[in-house]
Amino acid sequence: MILDDLVAATCQNMLARQAQKSLHDLQKEAAHITVSREFPFEKSLAQQKISVVAEIKQASPSKGQIVPSSEFDYQGIAKDYEVAGVDAISVLTEENYFKGSLDILKTVAADSATPVLRKDFTIDPYMIYEAKVAGSQIILLIVAILTDEQLKEYLSLANELGLSVIVEAHNEEEILRAVKANARIIGVNNRNLKDFTVDFDNTKRLRQLVPPEILFISESGIKDRSDVVTLEQIGVDGILVGETFMKAADKLAAIQQLRGEK
């Protein structure tokens, strides 16, 4: 199963990083960083207009190499996103399958005033502290790879550190688990992480299970303005878009097109 492979690779890479820097050392670094309770990303999601999370990634398990490594100007991409006024920038940090890194996250976070999401397969508190130290304001928790106890523990830790959390679900059971864990933001991934097929109706089907006070994001498979209009009509607060923007030669125009601004 692809998801199992991703989790295994994530664990192996995390253990290698832990050998270089202990959890205790990370915690000491995090303790020197100011904790804000502003949660700007959540405020953006709560506004009337649909929010846009624009992703930076050069590869994925489903598409392979999206952008040639020689053309992967992640700093330039982040600047384009910021100029376009996106509500958050998602940075892949998974190394093996998405060819991301914490260094990319650190650079983007340091250069940008826009909230940054660490997009990874968070499986341990170590990775949450890493995200904080790297400058991230948002993390991702995937229900499918965590127990109920882990979900609650990691949500609590993230809140202590001033991090917003997108809790990602793919089916009815996972939505209910996210709600039970008191998630403030739930994201529905239209891409099945087990076989990477896209089912855009997933958001439509699962939206009704999420209480209105919980912010709701649709992730993956969003290609054009008509998709966004459909999502707006069913009460989606935000969209996460990766491949569509990464493949666009003019990223500002692509973002404006999805927003209906041109």
Swiss-Prot record:
Pathway annotation from the record: Amino-acid biosynthesis; L-tryptophan biosynthesis; L-tryptophan from chorismate: step 4/5
GO MF annotation list: indole-3-glycerol-phosphate synthase activity; phosphoribosylanthranilate isomerase activity
Reactions catalysed according to its record: 1-(2-carboxyphenylamino)-1-deoxy-D-ribulose 5-phosphate + H(+) = (1S,2R)-1-C-(indol-3-yl)glycerol 3-phosphate + CO2 + H2O
GO biological process assignments: L-tryptophan biosynthetic process
InterPro entries in the cross-refs: Aldolase_TIM, Indole-3-glycerol_P_synth, Indole-3-glycerol_P_synth_dom, Indole-3-GlycerolPSynthase_CS, RibuloseP-bd_barrel
EC number annotated for this UniProt entry: 4.1.1.48
Pfam families in UniProt: IGPS
Keyword Lyase belongs to the record: yes
SUPFAM superfamilies: Ribulose-phoshate binding barrel
Keywords: Amino-acid biosynthesis, Aromatic amino acid biosynthesis, Decarboxylase, Lyase, Tryptophan biosynthesis
Family in the record: Belongs to the TrpC family.
HAMAP family in the cross-refs: IGPS_B
PANTHER family: INDOLE-3-GLYCEROL-PHOSPHATE SYNTHASE, TRYPTOPHAN BIOSYNTHESIS PROTEIN
Protein known as: Indole-3-glycerol phosphate synthase
Organism of this sequence: Leuconostoc mesenteroides subsp. mesenteroides (strain ATCC 8293 / DSM 20343 / BCRC 11652 / CCM 1803 / JCM 6124 / NCDO 523 / NBRC 100496 / NCIMB 8023 / NCTC 12954 / NRRL B-1118 / 37Y)
Upper lineage: Bacteria, Bacillati, Bacillota, Bacilli, Lactobacillales
